[in-house]
Swiss-Prot record:
It comes from Desulfitobacterium hafniense (strain Y51). The active site is at D79, E174 (proton acceptor). SUPFAM superfamilies: Bacterial exopeptidase dimerisation domain (SSF55031), Zn-dependent exopeptidases (SSF53187). Belongs to the peptidase M20B family. HAMAP family: Aminopeptidase_M20. This is Peptidase T. GO terms for cellular component: cytosol. The gene is pepT.
Length: 410
């Protein structure tokens, strides 16, 4: 078993699920169990400054060259999604995959099928790592952690490979949008970085959604239903009117690529008051602004119909498209693309239909595009990762480091 796979299997066995309701950093103490292990392993690899700071793990592999090679960072996150259990993960190896259904769990008759996930057919003959159907796998982002750690281990075992300063960080709470909150950019020390938090092999991303959340509060008036005529105002029904007036063709289930959306992801309410929880996503700044304006204008329209004060919308920006911060330093994307091509991986440059620590970090002065881990179907029981993709990720990391060293040797 290759070292990246061995590391990955050890890391996924540690429960690191984050918790959006918590106000601590990290949001869950169990993330520190992995943090302490990674700190210890970095020190064993010779990164003597390895440390845990505010729940973040940092370490630096000093340059072994006197040339002016830029300091490169590699970042992955320790937490797994709150959307599905990460407790007692039992990873399963499926060797020489034959293209048929994979029985994840005989007891519950849970099957990973190419009928549902046709991308499985791309990996016939390969070894896959799956769940046992009762938890997520945690390739998001423990695969990234394992790949970075394996690359660092390779460099320390091969001092003849010339490199500049390599900075490593593992963050908590990325899955709940707080992964960059306490990130020490200055202390990290990199000139630029890469998150290793992407999906299938070849993914290379430097654009992401502009993101906001919207809370729509709808006020009603409750009276006894037996005496309610011309008196009751049912906030649930008013809320439904707001919902259906937003474009039904602009939801996550009906959009792809560079298309934006409105996503209603929670409703809580009764006759007296109903609250709608939306997220708003778009790549273009003008389209993003129009979406926010649409939600505000719709509330005004509903208030004109039902009376002032029944509808109130509060919109909070969450993160921005990092493209504007990456474009001035596109060499970091070009190097990653060349690294992939050199090791036999076809680059798949695509926008991130989501967020990433790299977006926030880019606006904090650390340009940070995103590299693939190799995983599929994150945040659920059908998550899987081909082992060869993890091995290729390690090769890409090492090749990026090598290309920068070569460039500054001339």
């Amino acid at each position: 078993m290759s070292s990246v796979i061995e590391r990955f299997l050890r890391y996924v066995a540690i429960d690191t699920q984050s918790n959006e309701e918590s106000q601590t950093t990290p949001s869950t103490g169990k993330q520190l169990n992995l943090a302490r292990l990674l700190e210890q392993e970095l020190k064993e690899l010779g990164l003597q400054d390895a440390r845990i700071q505010e729940g973040y793990v940092y370490g630096t592999l000093p340059a072994n060259s006197t040339k002016a090679i830029p300091a490169i960072g590699f970042i992955a996150h320790m937490d797994t999604s709150p959307d599905f259990s990460g407790t007692n993960v039992k990873a399963q190896l499926v060797e020489n995959y034959d293209g048929q259904d994979i029985l994840l769990n005989p007891e519950h008759n849970l099957v990973l099928s190419p009928a549902d996930f046709p991308e499985l057919l791309d990996y016939i003959g390969k070894t896959l790592i799956t769940t046992d159907g009762t938890t997520l796998l945690g390739a998001d982002d423990k695969a990234g952690i394992a790949e970075i750690m394996t690359a660092i281990a390779y460099l320390t075992a091969h001092p003849e490979i010339e490199h500049g300063t390599i900075c490593v960080a593992f963050t908590p709470d990325e899955e709940i949008g707080r992964g960059a909150d306490q990130f020490d950019v200055a202390g990290f020390g990199a000139d630029f970085a890469y998150t290793v938090d992407g999906g299938p092999i070849g993914e290379l991303e430097y654009e992401n959604f502009n993101a906001a959340k919207a809370i729509v509060k709808v006020k009603g008036r409750n009276v006894h239903p037996g005496n309610a005529k011309n008196k009751m105002i049912n906030s649930i029904l008013l809320a439904n009117e707001y919902i259906v007036k937003l474009p039904p063709q602009e939801t996550p289930a009906t959009t792809e690529g560079y298309e934006g959306f409105y996503h209603l992801n929670d409703i809580r309410g009764d006759v007296e008051e109903t609250t709608l929880y939306y997220i708003i996503r778009d790549f273009a700044e003008d389209s993003f602004a129009k979406r926010k304006e649409t939600m505000l204008n719709l509330a005004e329209e509903c208030n004109k119909k039902y009376g002032s004060g029944h509808f109130h919308v509060e919109i909070t920006d969450q993160y921005k498209n990092m493209k504007e911060k990456i474009q001035p330093v596109m060499h970091i994307v070009d190097k990653a693309q060349k690294a992939m091509e050199t090791v036999g991986v076809k680059p798949l440059i695509k926008p991130i239909r989501g967020g990433t620590d790299g977006s926030r970090l880019s606006f904090m002065g650390l340009p940070t595009p995103n590299l693939f881990t190799g995983g599929h179907n994150y945040h659920g029981r059908y998550e899987f990762i081909p082992t060869f993709a993890m091995e290729k990720s390690v090769e890409v990391i090492l090749k990026i480091i090598e290309l920068y060293a070569e460039e500054h040797s001339n």
